[in-house]
Amino acid sequence: MEIFLDTANIEEIRKGVAWGIVDGVTTNPTLVSKENAVFEERIKEICETVEGPVSAEVVSTDYEGMVKEAREIANLSEFVVVKIPLIPDGIKAIKTLSKEGIKTNATLVFSPLQALLAAKAGATYVSPFIGRMDDIGNTGMDIVEEIEVIFSNYGYETKIIVASVRHPQHVLEAGLIGADVVTMPFEVLEKMFKHPMTDIGLERFLNDWKKYQDYLKSKNN
């Protein structure tokens, strides 16, 4: 499984990269706007930091606008993957961009049929939003499983990015079904480190070691 961070916060990205477990980053207009950063500069900075796939989203919604914007974004770095919304003009844009060798990530995917359209158009990635599906009473991970089956049936090379991840359980479920990529907020990645028995065990080891060192000191005095 590849782990992407879903953030535009450069400090979070640097920390995750320093741990050696972050393979890429996904952003969207909301995440970038929270950082009060110049879009192009921030995307370049992220690409220089992670040196892996970095998804940056277009804000146009018409075919010509999306293609123009996508070409400009793709020129920012070799690591850029252009996020395109799953709408008719978006699929048309993905087809054009894929022919030009520009990597794309079909975003706002909520059904296996949408993912199928993106794969047929040549999308590099599709991003099903599992958390938002859970919010409306569906089981988001079921959609990922169905997409996996469809892609396997027809040999599509499009990778699945499990998106809209809310908690570590989503990551576990994605891993159990063999998802290609999970993109998550930094706080979810942090939570994956944590287990109460780890803390208890570490504290016990350190206390025992301290007692042993104190014992050695007392013998030498």
Swiss-Prot record:
The keyword Cytoplasm applies. Pathway: Carbohydrate degradation; pentose phosphate pathway; D-glyceraldehyde 3-phosphate and beta-D-fructose 6-phosphate from D-ribose 5-phosphate and D-xylulose 5-phosphate (non-oxidative stage): step 2/3. One of its GO terms (molecular function) is transaldolase activity. It catalyses: D-sedoheptulose 7-phosphate + D-glyceraldehyde 3-phosphate = D-erythrose 4-phosphate + beta-D-fructose 6-phosphate. Coiled coil: none annotated. It holds the Pfam family TAL_FSA. Its EC number is 2.2.1.2. Belongs to the transaldolase family. Type 3B subfamily. This is Probable transaldolase. The gene is tal.
